[in-house]
Regions:
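Patatin-like phospholipase
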Residues: 3-139
Length: 139
């Protein structure tokens, strides 16, 4: 089996998901990611991920400059507590950004972005609400 996502994997590696497969084998060998196109287009679009610094309990907003070099931030932003090991980058232990700032609209407004796109990953009928400029708004 190419992809392992299991309790066995969690015990063996400390991660429920096979991170070597997800962040190295898949984008570098099996379904090669077009890093050159990403790097050419980054001058037109900023790409950020949100991670949580587990020692400070604060969000980390990482701007990706080179997808291959910065893949650790993508991994950290998807590393869920209890089923993933910390991802250590730049002297910090990082996990999923949802732990500290699940919908970082205000953070990006502080960075100067006036419009933000938020993609819901669940049925809109779940009652999920997002605080936008002091008002609760369903997105």
């Amino acid at each position: 089996m190419l992809f392992r996502s299991s309790t066995e994997n969690l015990i063996r590696t400390g991660n429920f998901v096979d991170t070597d497969f997800c962040y190295h084998e898949l984008p570098e060998i099996l379904d090669v990611y077009d890093y050159d196109t990403f790097n050419k287009n980054k001058e037109h679009t900023d790409f950020y991920v949100v991670c949580s610094d587990v020692e400070k309990g604060k969000p980390v907003y990482a701007k990706l400059h080179d997808m291959k070099r910065d893949i650790g931030y993508i991994q950290a932003s998807a590393s869920l507590p209890y089923v993933s090991k910390f991802v250590e980058l730049d002297g910090r232990k990082l996990l999923d950004g949802g732990c500290t700032d699940s919908v970082p609209v205000e953070a990006f407004r502080r960075l100067g972005y006036k419009r933000n796109v938020v993609v819901l990953t669940r049925d809109s009928g779940t009652g999920c609400r997002v605080l936008v400029s002091g008002r609760g708004r369903a997105l």
